Amino acid sequence: MKISVIYFSKGKVLKQIAEIVGEICGVEAIDMTSAHRLESTDLLFIGIDERKGKTDQAVFDYLDTFPSNTILGAAIFSVSKDGKDYTGFVSNQLMHKGITMFPKNLVVHSSSLFSKLSLKDLNKVKKYTETVLKAFNG
């Protein structure tokens, strides 16, 4: 199974999460703002920062470039200052393209996007990633 991990972050916490997800999956986590071309993939992990309940427009612009037949499944992880899940718009955009979404998104609460990931959250990220991998591997 081909797996890709991409993220959009202006802080440290989400980048840390993306790197952990990538490490577990055996791939490099790629910043959406870097020059790259996303190949077709079976499973895409997408990381996004949530600021004041909103996802940066750059994420939506990036996702608009996906041809609908290049990604089979996706899972979203995010960092939110208030701990709420604001990833619904991103999920809907991907489902509209015919991409199967993992039914639960991972939201990590962080009072600062520049803090360090706690051990509790680190374990949460690992468990989430392993659960998604099992679900998409059958």
Provide a role label for each language-model segment.
Residues 30-33:
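N-terminal short beta-loop-beta anion/metal-coordinating cradle
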Residues 3-4, 9, 13, 17-28, ...:
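FMN-binding flavodoxin-like domain, especially the glycine-rich phosphate-binding loop
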